[in-house]
C-alpha cells in the first residue's frame, strides 16, 4: 500500500463510535482488541524514543505523520524496541516472538513497540494500514508472524524482472510484512552455469547493490542465490570459486545466501557431494560472518513425485547437512498446494521443517495465461511445520502482487487467513481507483489451462452455474431462461467496461503495460459473447448473418492478437477467460449456427478455434502438455524441468490427415547425441516405418 499523507487537524483527539471493520486491509493480527471507537489525530504530537528505535521504523512513521512534531505538547507516540527506555513500561505486553510487536491506540497515547527492530517496523506498517482518511480505530494489538521467513523467490524461467520492478517489489514486501526476497532468476547468466564463477559486470553489480540497500530500508533480507549444479566440479578449485563469488556479493552488501541444485542432471545431483559443499560454505563463510543469516538450499529432488523411492537423496541431505541449513520444498509435485501429510513426509526425511517454495502464481509453463486469482489450497494449520514460505511469481511483477499480497497474509497468520477478503483487499491495494474493474478482469483470468503439471485453478465462479444452466438448456432444446440470458449479457457488458476502463488507467501504469495484450483479448471476447447472444435471440436471416459475419471478424482479430502479442518461445499467445467464458461462447456459437443451418438449409462454418492434431504419450511429464501450431510447425510446450523419459515410453503426434513431406525437423532442445530413441511414421497407425535422422546441434 502507498504511504498515506495524513493532514492532522484540530488540537485534541475526537472520538466516534465506528467499528474497525471499516474496510481496513491488513494481515490478520494474532490478538486484536477494539473499543468500537475511532480517533482523529491532532495536529501536534510528541515522538518518544525516536533516537533509540529502528531508524527505518522511525522514518516510516514520519512519512505517515505530517502534523507538527513538538517536544513539549501533543499526544505522545512511543516507539522503540523491547528494553528501550521509551517502551520499557510496556515490556510485558510485547510478544516474545521474533518480529513481534505491541501496538495500542487510545485517546491518551500511541504505542509502537517491537520485540526487535523488525517488530517495531511491522508495528508501523500495521499503524499505516489502520489509518483511514485521517482516523484510527481505538485498538490494542499483540502480533507476530506464524512463519519465520515469508516472501518471494524470483526463480522463474523467462524474462527476469526489470530493476525498477524489483525496487517496487521490495517496497511492497516491507509494507506487507514480508521479510525475504530470494534473487534467483533463471535467465541471469551470473547466477547459473557457466558464468556463476565470474563476478558481475560493473553495471549489474551497482544495480544489485541498490537492491540490497532498498531491501534493508524495507526490512527485507535480500537473499542472493547461486545455481552451480549443472557444471560444478567437486574439487577445491570450484569450492574456492564459489566462496569467492559469495565474498564479492558480501562486499556488495548481501547478507543472505542460497545455493540451488534444482532442474539439473548429471554429477551435480550427488547428495553426498552437495552436503559436503554446503557444509563447507556454512562453516567457512556463513558462520564465520556473524551478520549472515542461515544458508538456504534448493535440492535436486525438490518435490515428492521426483524423489526416488529406492534412493536416499533426501535422507542423505537430512543426515549430512548442518542443522542450520534450510532445505526448500515445492510439495507433492513441482506445482502443488502444501498439505499436512505432504509436509510431514518431507520433514521426516530432511530432519528439519521444510522451507516451502510455492510455485504460484508462476506461469513460466503457461505463459499465454495470467494468473490473477485468489490464493487457496494450502493447509492453514502447519505453520510450525515449515521454516519459511515463499511464493514464486509470474514474470509480470505488478500483476503478481495480487498473489504476493495474499501469500503475505497467509504466511503471517494462516489460521485466520481469509481467501476472498484477502484477494479483494489485494486488488484494492494495487489499483484502488479501478478496483471493481480489476476484480472483474482477475475473476476471469485465474486458471492455467491444460498443462503438463495438471495444476488448475477456479475461474469465473460467479457466473459458472449460470453458464452451465444456460448452455445445457439451449443445446438440448434451443430454449433458455430469460434471467440466465440477462445475467450472461450483463457479464459481457461488465467485461467490456472493465477492459476499456483498465486500458486507459494511469494509476498503476506498469501493471497496465503488463496486462494490455490480455485486456485487448478480453474486450474482443466480451464483444463476441454479446454478438453470439444476439444470434441466439434473433435468428432471422439478415440479422443472423450480420451477427455471424461480425463474430467471424472478431475471431480473426482474436487470432491476430494471439499470434502477434506475447510471442515468447515457449507458450506464445494471449489466452483469456479460457475455462468458463470462452468455452461457453464457443459452444453457444456452434449451437446457434447448427440450428440456423438446419432451419434454412445453409452451410455456415461453425468452427471457433481448435487443435486438429492430437498428442498421445505415456511419458508422465509430457502426456498432458498442450500442442501448438505455428505455420508448418507443431510445438509441444517445452518443460522447464529435466524430463524423465523411461525406456519403452513414447510420444506420438496424431495428425488430422495424411500429409506429403519431403523433410522433418525435430528439436529436443539438447545438443547431446540422440542415441536413446528412434523415430517412426505411419499412415494408418498400424504399420510403422523407422526413419533415420541426422543430428545437427539440437536438431534431428
Show which residues each predicted segment covers:
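Active-site-proximal loop/turn and secondary-structure-junction residues that shape catalytic pockets
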Residues: 158, 169, 187-189, 226-230, ...
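Bacterial Sec-dependent N-terminal signal peptides
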Residues: 1-24
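Feature activates predominantly on carbohydrate-active enzymes
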Residues: 95-241, 245, 251-255, 287
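Acidic, contiguous N-terminal accessory segments
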Residues: 21-107, 134-141
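Disordered, acidic Ser/Thr/Pro-rich linker "stalks" and the adjacent N-terminal cap
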Residues: 557, 581-677, 681-685, 694-697
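Substrate-binding groove of N-acetylhexosamine-processing glycoside hydrolases
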Residues: 25-27, 33, 280-308, 313-617
